[in-house]
Regions:
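C-terminal and inter-domain tail/linker signature
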Residues: 1-140
Length: 140
């Protein structure tokens, strides 16, 4: 497997979510993920509770392939970063074990201040060091 430093991958991964240029975002998606790669999100507790109230035992949100990943990242950018209030940053301490990278991230106010959100990311990599599956667990 490609020699990848976990913290470097974490920085590139998190930078993608704050990238304002749509073409650069798409290029970063294609560089980070393997073709057909997936982003699987455990939704926030509020959404899980609403789903349970509707009779769903579990709720998982998924994006597969470059086009769906592009939509997912773009919508996150538009909601959280584009208005100019927040940005995302990787926290220190990313680690790699074989083909798995674990990292933590946070959403912070532009200009500094305490994190208002964040989460855990578990990335499964292919033999070329590209993401095949990205498991996101939001929440601080």
């Amino acid at each position: 497997m490609t020699d990848i430093h976990a913290q470097d991958l974490a920085a590139r991964y998190i930078a993608l979510w704050s990238e304002p240029d749509a073409e650069l975002r798409r290029r970063a998606i294609e560089e980070l993920w393997a073709e057909g790669g997936a982003h699987i999100l455990q939704p926030p507790q509020e959404i899980r509770e609403i789903a349970a109230g509707l009779g769903f035992d579990s709720t998982t949100l998924q994006a597969h392939g470059y086009d769906e990943l592009d939509v997912r990242v773009t919508r996150s950018y538009e909601r959280f970063v584009a208005p100019g209030q927040f940005t995302f940053q990787a926290r220190d301490g990313a680690v790699r074990l074989h083909d798995v990278v674990k990292l933590n991230w946070e959403m912070v106010p532009v200009g500094g201040g305490e994190a208002v959100g964040g989460g855990l990311e578990v990335l499964v990599l292919d033999e070329n060091g590209r993401i095949t599956t990205d498991y996101m667990f939001p929440g601080i």
